Regions:
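Membrane-interface alpha helices of multi-pass inner-membrane proteins
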Residues: 64-68, 262-289, 328, 424-428
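Signature aromatic-anchored transmembrane alpha helix within multi-pass, membrane-resident enzymes
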Residues: 259-270, 288-289, 308-313, 418, ...
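Membrane-embedded, hydrophobic transmembrane alpha-helices
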Residues: 1-97
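Intrinsically disordered, polar/acidic, low-complexity terminal segments
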Residues: 336-366, 371, 459-542
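Membrane-lumen/periplasm interface segments of specific transmembrane helices
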Residues: 116-119, 160, 306-383
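Perimembrane helix-loop-helix junctions
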Residues: 86-96, 283-313
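Hydrophobic, aromatic-rich transmembrane alpha-helices
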Residues: 20, 24, 180-196, 371-411
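Active-site lumenal/periplasmic loops and adjacent helix-entry segments of GT-C-fold
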Residues: 113-205, 210, 226-229
């Protein structure tokens, strides 16, 4: 079947699968942790149902990476994840809340238009697709990063994406990103229309305005709001998850109200962010602060608190072990976290990758001239454009907040925000102030303007809906609308790369992209793959 109706049907079928998979996982972990988190639970006034699809993605990714310890993901066992859907029969649906989720589904019709002008990201051909191919063709490979350095920063997204190769058009990978866009707009919409927790209202309204401002400004726009990327990148999911999770954590702290079901969901989302990308570790600043206030308010020890999420801690340990086996480092490519006496570890190789990674992101070395670094950073046109538009957006939204909203000052909240933003900015300054990584923090900065602000007069829901619809329409690029067709179904095709022989294997004849070829690597180093044991071991040749 190859028509537009089936295309939309395929997306909604995928959405429903993730929805009920996420629900299954929460039912299971509720039993394991003895924390009640049923279909009637609310997270800061938000129905738990809006988080089901994202939790489903988290569950699918963790099932797949654990399975990959034993077998390649082309193995039929990868599809056993479908069996977990049976768990749904053990708990009745909250029909009212499910109905509210269905109301939000039309959001995706607009967002799906982005599929008509989508293609592979440069990094997809560089390492993502070949990494996924290795995951599909082999169980966990010791020293995988020796084949090609970027394989070492493998995200949980690689495992999810490799599973989605079942769709030969690669659209399911794009659909996964779209689900995160839907989460963001559902989060904003619910906060502005039916959430009784008014602390989330003003910040959400400012985020909505900010999303519209993204389409105007220097060089036509872009101010740090989410941008639908080409297939193969996971920066958008990280930005959305970071924003939503940090807002929820801060809201719990500021309200001084702590519930076990919220603690459990926050823990899931925080772990997911870290698994998506190592730079997501910044969420730990918010999470640790939340844990401190939670244990203080409930008067329990940190060990008793963490015992409630033993299963998630075990998942974390297996994830770090995976990194250690594939790279020799707990946190790749941080050379100081590597175990150098492992047979597949080469210290010089790791140090070189660490330096390349930090320098590629225009990182700042403390002690060097900040003035020179800023000048160099702003020489990149994208950095200059986004930063300028972001500052203008912030100033405009600040003025709007002063005119149309009342500010109830709270010194404690301001101190917490100052400390946590300072720590986050210093981290990104040192380890990668790339605009792609900063999007979540930039959106949180916009939201923070609205903290402790309440409308002077009620904002008509009709106006909110008009603004939301306008913002949604602007999410797909203009070229996507131009490419939209009722007769052509979106698909992307793998390009063919010319190869040369290097060290007895294949390498790109020009450039550095292998696309999908397990015998290809752009690595100039020579390596050896030992296939004699149950696990393949890759070592660099001297």
């Amino acid at each position: 079947m190859d028509n537009i109706i089936f295309f939309f049907f395929k997306f909604y079928l995928y959405y429903i699968f993730l929805y009920f998979l996420g629900r299954s996982f929460l039912i299971l972990i509720s039993k394991l942790s003895k924390i009640k988190i049923d279909s009637f639970a609310k997270i800061q006034g938000l129905e738990i149902q809006i988080f089901y699809p994202v939790v489903g993605i988290f569950f699918l990714g963790n099932y797949l990476y654990l399975l990959n310890y034993l077998v390649p993901l082309s193995h039929p066992a990868a599809y056993f994840s479908l069996l977990f859907l049976i768990v749904n029969i053990y708990e009745p649906l909250n029909r009212a809340a499910t109905k509210n989720v269905i109301i939000n589904l039309p959001f995706y019709v607009i967002i799906l238009i982005s599929s008509f002008d989508i293609n592979f990201h440069y990094d997809a051909g560089l390492y993502h697709l070949n990494n996924q191919l290795w995951i599909r063709e082999s169980n966990i490979v010791f020293g995988l990063s020796n084949i090609y350095g970027p394989f070492g920063v493998g995200s949980i997204y690689e495992y999810i994406s490799s599973f989605l190769w079942v769709d030969k058009t690669f659209m399911l990978i794009h659909f996964t990103n779209i689900i995160f866009v839907g989460l963001l707009f559902s989060f904003i919409f619910i906060n502005l229309t039916r959430n009784k927790n008014q602390q989330l209202y003003t910040g959400s309204f400012l985020l909505l305005l900010y999303s519209i401002f993204d389409n105007f400004g220097l060089t036509g726009g872009r101010n740090g709001f989410i941008n639908i990327q080409s297939i193969g990148k996971q920066d958008l999911p990280i930005a959305v998850l970071f924003l939503v999770t940090s807002i929820l954590l801060l809201t719990s702290i500021f309200r001084n109200r702590y519930k076990e079901e919220e603690f459990l969901l926050y823990s899931i989302l925080a772990l997911f962010i870290f698994q998506l990308k190592i730079s997501g570790v910044v969420i730990s600043f918010f999470y640790i602060l939340f844990l401190y206030y939670y244990k203080t308010e409930k008067n329990i020890t940190i060990f008793k608190l963490l015992s409630k999420i033993k299963f998630l801690i075990i998942l974390s340990l297996f994830w770090l072990t995976k990194s250690l086996l594939q790279t020799g480092c707990v946190i790749f490519p941080l050379e100081s976290s590597c175990i150098t006496n492992l047979s597949w570890v080469n210290s010089d190789y790791l140090l070189n990758i660490e330096n390349v990674t930090v320098n590629f992101s225009n990182s700042y070395y403390f002690g060097e001239s900040l003035k020179i670094w800023i000048e160099t950073y702003l020489e990149v046109p994208t950095n200059q454009t986004i930063l300028f538009n972001y500052i203008i957006s912030l100033l405009t939204l600040y003025i709007i907040s002063k005119i149309f909203f009342i500010n109830y000052k709270n010194i404690k909240k301001h101190k917490i925000l100052f400390i946590i933003f300072s720590a986050s900015c210093l981290f990104y300054l040192r380890f990668g102030p790339d605009m792609r990584y900063l999007s979540g923090l930039m959106m949180l900065g916009v939201y923070s303007i609205g903290i402790n602000h309440y409308p002077r007069k009620n904002i008509p829901i009709f106006l909110v809906k008009i603004l939301l619809l306008s913002s949604l329409i602007m999410v797909p690029k203009l070229d996507s609308y131009k490419s939209f067709s009722l007769s052509n179904v979106p698909r992307v095709l793998l390009p063919e790369e010319k190869m040369i022989e290097r060290h007895g294997r294949l390498a790109p004849s020009s450039g550095d992209r292998c696309w999908v070829n397990i015998n290809c690597s752009a690595n100039f180093e020579n390596y050896n793959i030992d296939n004699s044991g149950y696990f393949k071991i890759v070592t660099l040749k001297k």
